[in-house]
């Protein structure tokens, strides 16, 4: 799966990039038909809810699955987005089986 990672309003370190790539590799094993994914990591102004935002747009044939989560760290936000995508993938697989 081709994964494009974008950073908005900050420069990512190597550790964060490797973390995101590792998580996306795990997600790729979960869904067989994924074409690619766009991961957008950005800083937001809202510190109460968490100012780190991770948006993942997963491209699959005929559909796009999108999850956006906030956290106090980018790792937390990415984990929450991945979990949301896993739930969406389960629903998508259920629709395909009908």
What residue ranges belong to the model's regions?
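N-terminal, polar/charged subdomain of small-to-medium soluble alpha/beta proteins
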Residues: 1-98
């Amino acid at each position: 799966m081709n994964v494009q990672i974008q950073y908005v309003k900050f420069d990512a370190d190597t550790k964060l990039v490797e973390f995101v790539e590792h998580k996306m590799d795990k997600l790729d094993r979960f869904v067989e038909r994924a074409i690619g994914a766009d991961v957008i990591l950005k800083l937001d102004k809202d510190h109460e809810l968490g100012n780190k935002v991770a948006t993942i747009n997963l491209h699959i044939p005929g559909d796009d699955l999108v999850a956006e989560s906030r956290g106090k760290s980018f790792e937390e936000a990415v984990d929450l987005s991945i979990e949301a995508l896993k739930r969406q993938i389960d629903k998508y697989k259920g629709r395909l089986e009908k």
